[in-house]
Amino acid sequence: ARQVINSYNQTFVNTVRATGGNNAIRCLMVPTYAASCSSTTVSDFVLPTDTVANKLIVDIHSYSPYNFALNTSGTSSFTQSDISQLQWTLQEIYNSFGAKGIPVIIGEFGALNKNNINDRVLWGENYLRIAKSYNIRCIWWDNNAFDTSGENFRLLNRGTLTWQYPELLEAMMKGLNS
């Protein structure tokens, strides 16, 4: 399956480049298998060849640490151990891509609402502070879900145009600016 995604990525790059215009030179994002940042998936990833130098960006998803950020049955407390795990994960992403001159974007990240805003604030500040130290850009997965159990990652209330958790947003900005 991983080889199939590698093949799809190469076909995507070839197809977009062949259409001409701005597509001949624009940046393109290519995912690992399932956009996973697991070490096995990353080691099986093959960056497509491209006719334009330095215009490919690897896209991965990282809900880390898993038991805090994504596991509905996991912990709601963000601990020093979680900071260490987050540091390790982001360093591995950097070592696999950024250190080799390959841009990488975390195209999805977030932490479930488990009625633990203070812990999510601490997590958000640390996540973006550490990611910034490795020059990794992150995109919050805002799926507009709020009133459900499970993957409720809404930050922006699209109906009222207000932030659902302004303190989390402020903490992430603090992490970026530290």
Residue ranges and their predicted role:
Residues 1-74, 91-112, 133-134:
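Active-site region of glycoside hydrolase catalytic domains
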Residues 1-7, 78-85, 118-119:
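Alpha-helix N-cap and loop-to-helix initiation/capping positions
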Residues 50-55, 78-84, 127-129, 162:
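Short, surface-exposed linear patches
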Residues 67-86, 160:
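Acidic/histidine-rich helix-loop elements
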Residues 86-177:
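Substrate-binding cleft of secreted/luminal carbohydrate-active enzymes
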